[in-house]
Amino acid sequence: MKIPRDLSGAQLVKVLCRDWGYRVAHQEGSHIILQTEEPAHQRLSIPNHNPVRVGTLNSIIRAVSRHKGVERQELLDTLR
């Protein structure tokens, strides 16, 4: 599946918090900082832009899928 090109930062944060166990730690300017303790500590910086650039989104998806030990495709399916 292709990476969505119309996904906003707020939508991405909502999906990561709802489906993948992340929570909002704080916000610094236009970036929302998420963190999780499952399976280990990780912090992510999500730009609160509309839309999030494709390369940035791809990097975030890669980081989450590696940390959670899931396939990239499984993560992309939850973004739709």
Give, region by region, the residue ranges found by the protein language model.
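Short, flexible active-site loop motifs that bind/organize anionic cofactors or intermediates
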Residues: 2, 47, 65
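Generic N-terminal initiation segments characterized by hydrophobic and/or small/turn-forming residues
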Residues: 4, 9, 13, 41, ...
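Compositionally biased, intrinsically disordered low-complexity segments
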Residues: 18, 27, 35-36, 64-67, ...
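A short, structured beta-strand/loop element
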Residues: 23-59
